[in-house]
């Protein structure tokens, strides 16, 4: 694996010179191997190690290099045709392979090659970008978007129209992460490498980026870039220092544990916020 990483790192340093016409065989094979490993879930752009999320920047570099070495090509797609550098993940799937991998794909859901989809996942008409990782038992609902390199945990529900931000550039940026057993309400947006920790519930229409204040009304604490585990979050406002105006924020209205979540439905958690 180290040799593969070295090839990617070296090629990335001269990426401006690389074109589909002049890409050397070693680089091309290395990039294609990484994309295949991402596609199968053998590698992932970010993973939790000793309780901390670690981003493997060299894998992002490989994804970016894939855009340099590949030319646009016509892509067949049922009622339409497309023209892009990245093939579709399911282009060569037959019924046997779908059965073996054990997930459902509802037309016209689109998944790019280099994204991993785990067993028992359901993809309604949605979009999953290259480098993304969608773990077991997750529902990606209608018109939801999973951005490039985003990491989605087990048993997550991404409701209709949810946007999970992608991150290929800037290179140092970390991917957006939704941990296990989270619920993201309809039309919410989680972007810019924000981490929603395990068991959290995000209400409908909540927008969270790195600069969004995440206010815990029980403690008065303000978080940035991270929703603590077990949080129930709704959209809200905080007053300015001079009291003349208010600015948007996300509000943690309560904390719940796994036992409570098991007994109480998502709708009840969101409706009883007083």
Swiss-Prot record:
Any one GO molecular function term: nucleotidyltransferase activity
Gene3D superfamilies in UniProt: Hexapeptide repeat proteins, Tetrahydrodipicolinate-N-succinyltransferase, N-terminal domain
Cross-referenced InterPro entries: DapD_Trfase_Hexpep_rpt_fam, Hexapep, Hexapep_transf_CS, THP_succinylTrfase_dom1, THP_succinylTrfase_N_sf, Trimer_LpxA-like_sf
Enzyme Commission code: 2.3.1.117
UniProt keyword terms in alphabetical order: Acyltransferase, Amino-acid biosynthesis, Cytoplasm, Diaminopimelate biosynthesis, Lysine biosynthesis, Repeat, Transferase
PROSITE patterns on file: HEXAPEP_TRANSFERASES
Reaction it catalyzes: (S)-2,3,4,5-tetrahydrodipicolinate + succinyl-CoA + H2O = (S)-2-succinylamino-6-oxoheptanedioate + CoA
Similarity comment: family membership: Belongs to the transferase hexapeptide repeat family.
Subunit structure: Homotrimer.
PANTHER family in the record: 2,3,4,5-TETRAHYDROPYRIDINE-2,6-DICARBOXYLATE N-SUCCINYLTRANSFERASE (PTHR19136:SF52), MOLYBDENUM COFACTOR GUANYLYLTRANSFERASE (PTHR19136)
Protein name, UniProt field: 2,3,4,5-tetrahydropyridine-2,6-dicarboxylate N-succinyltransferase
Organism, scientific name: Shigella dysenteriae serotype 1 (strain Sd197)
Gene: dapD
């Amino acid at each position: 694996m180290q040799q593969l990483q070295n090839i990617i790192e070296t090629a990335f340093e001269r990426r401006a010179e690389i074109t589909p016409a002049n890409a050397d065989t070693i680089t091309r094979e290395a990039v294609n191997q990484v994309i295949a490993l991402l596609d199968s879930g053998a590698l992932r752009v970010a993973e939790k190690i000793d309780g901390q999320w670690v981003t493997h920047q060299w894998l992002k570099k490989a994804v970016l290099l894939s855009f340099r070495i590949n030319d646009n090509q016509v892509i067949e797609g049922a009622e339409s045709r497309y023209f892009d550098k990245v093939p579709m993940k399911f282009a060569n799937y037959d019924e046997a392979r779908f059965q073996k991998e054990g997930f459902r794909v509802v037309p016209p859901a689109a998944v790019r090659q280099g994204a991993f989809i785990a067993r028992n996942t359901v993809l309604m008409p949605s979009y999953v970008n290259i480098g993304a990782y969608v773990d077991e038992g997750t529902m990606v609902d209608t018109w939801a978007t999973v951005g490039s390199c985003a990491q989605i945990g087990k048993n997550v529900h991404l409701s209709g129209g949810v946007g999970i931000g992608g991150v290929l550039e800037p290179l140092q940026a970390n991917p957006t992460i939704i941990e296990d057993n989270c619920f993201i309400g309809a039309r919410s947006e989680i972007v810019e490498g924000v981490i929603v920790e395990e068991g959290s519930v995000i209400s409908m229409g909540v927008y969270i980026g790195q600069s969004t204040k995440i206010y815990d009304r029980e403690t008065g604490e303000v978080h940035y870039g991270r929703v603590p585990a077990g949080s129930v979050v709704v959209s809200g406002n905080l007053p300015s220092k001079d009291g003349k105006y208010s600015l948007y924020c996300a509000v943690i209205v309560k904390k719940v544990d796994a036992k409570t979540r098991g007994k109480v439905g998502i709708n009840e958690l969101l409706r009883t916020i007083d």
